[in-house]
Amino acid sequence: MKLHELKAAEGSRRVRNRVGRGAGSGNGKTSGRGQKGQKARSGGGVRPGFEGGQLPLFRRLPKRGFTNINRKEYAIVNLDQLNKFEDGTEVTPALLVETGVVKNEKSGIKVLGNGSLDKKLTVKAHKFSASAVEAIDAKGGAHEVI
């Protein structure tokens, strides 16, 4: 068998259904849209959430909450991600962005205690969880809130 003799397995490729190409095709005349009505017209159809004139669910339910304009979202770094740095490294937010550990700094960096830390590091971040502080200090490293 040669490359030009390869054939797709039977039934693995679905043939595109061309509508409006004669009665014999099975999808001629109205092209599977039925007779008249909003859904038969070009550009026709109802908007998402429309329930035929009945008050839609999203309007029947009460509004809840608000968006806090002062919300701070922190970029999360876990302990096991810090293992990629050499012993004695000073880990700063700039270094974390540069090495691709976090994509962008957002409102700051928060170090969480997931995973285990194997290196002695000086970590500078905006926030630390209690378990992260414990793990960093246990390895002889230091943490600094900036």
UniProtKB/Swiss-Prot annotation:
Biased composition (Basic and acidic residues): 1-13
UniProt feature, compositional bias: Gly residues: 21-35, 42-52
Keyword Kinase (UniProt): no
Source superkingdom: Bacteria
Function noted in UniProt: Binds to the 23S rRNA.
Protein family: Belongs to the universal ribosomal protein uL15 family.
Protein name: Large ribosomal subunit protein uL15
Naturally occurring in which organism (per UniProt): Staphylococcus haemolyticus (strain JCSC1435)
Lineage: Bacteria, Bacillati, Bacillota, Bacilli, Bacillales
Gene behind this protein: rplO
